[in-house]
Design a protein with these regions (language model features):
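Conserved SAM/SAH cofactor-binding pocket of Class I
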Residues: 87-190
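Class I S-adenosyl-L-methionine
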Residues: 135-142, 146, 244, 248-251, ...
Length: 270
């Protein structure tokens, strides 16, 4: 198999970015720049690249094959134990950067790979805690914290973001709270693309209506927040009005930041 045949294979399996994905895949294994592929499109490639291309065509995300993903211009380690960082989530990190000042405390609930809290702490001299229920995901976050040299300013804690004395204490101490929680309806997950279904179900499943985490965070945690603190939540494409109504019932303000497609994506709660 060569570059041209890999592009053909990926295209036949409905991968829109076949050319770029093929070049990145090959570059990962042979250490050559992606441009090498165009100049050597018909050169036979080793079996390990062929096997990786077949996995990619079958629906395994490229990021899980290469073990890397980009977020806020930085490279992060990822594995099938964590969600793959997405461009729309950068709006959440950017919102945190606007609210977090030097010396403040940041709390990231459902931290996953740690890309949100790490990207913020790289840019603001503050401290923070990332909370994650999954031990394997927490190991990924620790590795990323080491890669990006965050040091003692970041604590990573294994706890249930929905039900933990540790979390309620952290909420009461934080100046800025961020979360990209699970928000997909349980019965929708199995209808999604193979790429999405490859991601950890624990990080996708937001309960029957996708609102489990928002209900807890907004109804209960906002009452614990100190004066002046803000909560920033990524929400699903069709959840903004329900989140707004939830904030109204809880007696807290709510505004939204739109994503690259003009969809309300980040709820600013406080």
């Amino acid at each position: 198999m060569n570059y041209s045949s890999i592009v053909k294979l990926l295209t036949e399996h409905g991968i829109a970015s076949a050319s770029n994905d093929a070049a990145e895949l090959i570059s990962h294994f042979n250490g050559k720049p992606p441009s090498w592929c165009l100049a050597n499109r018909d050169q036979n490639l080793p079996p390990e690249i062929t096997k990786a291309a077949e996995r990619l065509a079958a629906g395994t995300p490229l990021q899980y094959i290469t073990g890397r993903a980009w977020f806020m211009g930085d490279k992060y380690f990822v594995s099938p134990d964590v969600l793959i960082p997405q461009p729309d989530t950068e709006h959440l990190a950017e919102a945190a950067l606007k609210h977090l000042k030097p010396g403040m405390r940041l709390l990231d609930l459902c931290t996953g790979s740690g890309c949100i809290i790490i990207s913020v702490l790289k840019r603001v001299i503050a401290s923070g805690t990332g909370v994650e229920l999954s031990a394997p995901a927490l190991a990924v976050a620790r590795r990323n914290a080491e890669i990006h040299k965050i040091g003692s300013r970041l604590e990573l804690t294994q706890a249930d973001a929905l039900d933990s004395d540790i979390v309620t204490k952290l909420v009461s101490e934080a100046d800025v709270i961020v979360s990209n929680p699970p928000y997909i309806n349980t019965d929708v997950i199995d209808t999604l693309s193979p790429q999405v279904r490859s991601e950890p179900r624990l990080a996708l499943d937001g309960g029957p209506d996708g609102m489990r985490f928002y209900n807890r965070f907004i109804t209960d945690y906002t009452r614990l927040m100190k004066p002046g603190a803000v909560m920033l939540l990524e929400v699903g494409y069709d959840q903004a009005e329900r989140v707004r109504a939830l904030c109204g019932s809880a007696g807290v303000s709510c505004a939204f930041i739109k994503d690259y497609s003009g969809i309300d994506r980040v709820a600013v709660v406080g």
